[in-house]
C-alpha cells in the first residue's frame, strides 16, 4: 500500500527521472509503474493495447493525486503516459524507440516486464510469437534504448549514483514450465 510518506514530489524546476515499463497496464507491470510514478518518476507505460494502457494511465494519475495530496497532477510535477508498443513486431519496437528518442534525451530505468503465454502463432517477422514477445522483442528494445540509458550518468541527485548509467530490470516467470516444446515453431 502506498502512503503519502512514499510520495516524492519532484520540483518543477528539475526534470524528473524517466522510466519505461513494458506490459504496464495490468499486474506486476502496473504496480511497478504506479510505484515509480508516486516516487517521482515520469513513467511511460509501454502497452500493446491502447485502451487498456490509457485506462492504466488514468488509474495511476488518480493514485498520484490521492497519495500525494494534490487534485492537480501538474502541481505534483510528474505523471504517467502511454506510448503504444507491441513486442511481437520489430517495426513497433523501432517506432517506439524513435518516438522516445525524439521526446526524451535520457532514460533512467527500463523495466522489461511484458510477456505473453501463447504458442504456435508466427509473427510478421517470422518468429514464434511467444519467443519474440518475451525474449527477442525485449532484447531489441533494450539494445535500441542503450544510448538513452547511458546518458543517465550525472542525472542523479545523490553522488552515490552520479557516475552510473540507467538501470535495466528484466522480469521473468515460471510459466515456461507449463508450455510444451514445439520444435517446429522455434526454427
PLM regions: where:
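Rossmann-fold NAD(P)H-dependent dehydrogenase/reductase core
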Residues: 2-187
Amino acid at each position: 500500500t502506498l502512503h503519502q510518506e512514499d510520495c516524492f514530489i519532484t520540483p518543477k524546476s528539475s526534470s524528473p527521472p524517466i522510466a519505461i515499463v513494458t506490459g504496464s497496464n495490468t499486474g506486476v507491470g502496473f504496480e511497478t509503474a504506479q510505484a515509480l510514478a508516486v516516487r517521482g518518476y515520469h513513467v511511460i507505460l509501454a502497452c500493446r493495447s491502447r485502451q487498456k494502457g490509457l485506462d492504466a494511465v488514468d488509474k495511476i494519475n488518480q493514485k498520484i493525486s490521492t497519495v500525494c495530496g494534490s487534485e492537480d497532477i501538474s502541481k505534483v510535477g510528474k505523471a504517467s503516459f502511454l506510448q503504444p508498443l507491441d513486442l511481437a513486431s520489430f517495426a513497433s519496437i523501432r517506432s517506439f524507440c524513435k518516438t522516445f528518442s525524439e521526446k526524451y534525451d535520457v532514460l533512467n530505468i527500463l523495466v522489461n516486464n511484458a510477456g505473453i503465454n501463447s504458442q504456435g502463432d508466427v509473427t510478421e517477422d517470422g518468429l514464434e510469437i511467444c519467443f519474440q514477445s518475451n525474449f527477442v522483442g525485449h532484447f531489441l528494445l533494450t539494445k535500441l534504448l542503450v544510448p538513452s540509458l547511458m546518458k543517465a550518468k550525472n542525472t542523479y541527485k545523490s553522488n552515490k549514483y552520479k557516475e552510473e548509467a540507467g538501470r535495466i530490470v528484466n522480469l521473468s516467470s515460471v510459466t515456461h514450465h507449463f508450455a510444451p516444446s514445439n520444435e517446429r515453431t522455434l526454427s
